[in-house]
Amino acid sequence: MTLGRVTALFLLGLSAARLAPAAGAESYDPALLREMHWRMIGPHRGGRTKAAAGIPDRPGVFYVGVCNGGVWKTDDFGRTWSPIFDDQPTGSIGAIAIAPSNPDVLYVGSGEGLQRPDLSTGDGIYKSLDGGRTWRHLGLRAGRQIPQIVVDPRDPNRLLVAVLGSPYGPGPERGIFRSTDGGETFEKVLYRDEDTGAVDVVLDPADARTAYAVLWEARQAPWENGTFNGPGSGVYKTTDGGTTWRPIVSGLPTFAEDGLGRIGITVAPSNPRRLFATVEAKRKAGLYRSDDAGETWTLINADPRVTDRASDFAEVKVHPQDPDTVFTASIVTWKSTDG
């Protein structure tokens, strides 16, 4: 089982737990979970897993997207899998988003959203209205890589899309795009330049009009070595649904002084003022925390193992009920219980 698949399914479990159990839900002995061990549950095709999404009130149903194997769905907790994207012209998947208010509505971003010699690009964003049985292409074809999509919890037609762009050269179809009509049209709302794309976007769990986006300036050469650090990289915040954005950089590394590269970001579901960011840089790399909704940042862990291979992973997640329990993914998955 690849690290990417382990990490994606592990973090999927965290996101699926975000909603509290319904009244009268069956109780369980927590000691049973302590006896569980990692095991391969598939699917057995397509290489590394880049995307995963689940439905909180349907815990047996979840989806994974792999770098060259399309989208797979299970409805029996991973015992069996069905490929549901094979009739589409691309198999490279970077993002899967389920509309929280209507879990039959799925959005899939193609192009895995990495900068590495063996990457695979896609051809835009897709939508399903029937849980993945049928798909329609929506656009953003020239974006080539879509590593993240977030959907308004109350409105399945409002979404923000992170578009990284072509890995091999400049292009204008990069940045954060917004749709308010279910993907019929897209508006570019955060853009820096033709060399800088968006690699991550997250919503404030208490206010969907507040979002945080990560821009990343990087370029993959046709040979082994690429450029993964650039002046365009940084974190941005909106409080008006994406109409306006501003950089939030106080305490974070800069490119000019520290060689800033890729950043991964998350918001604590139980405390929206607490954010964590994994920051790749030539100096001052590490795990950063903000306790004031991103206005200031503090380096809390500089152990290089926590951010190893950050240009590939850059994943950080917080426990749904405990803002001090944090998970990061590098070569291995790390856990902290003290914030």
Which residues are covered by each model-predicted region?
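Beta-propeller blade termini and top-face loops
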Residues: 23-339
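N-terminal secretory signal peptides that target proteins for export/translocation
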Residues: 1-3
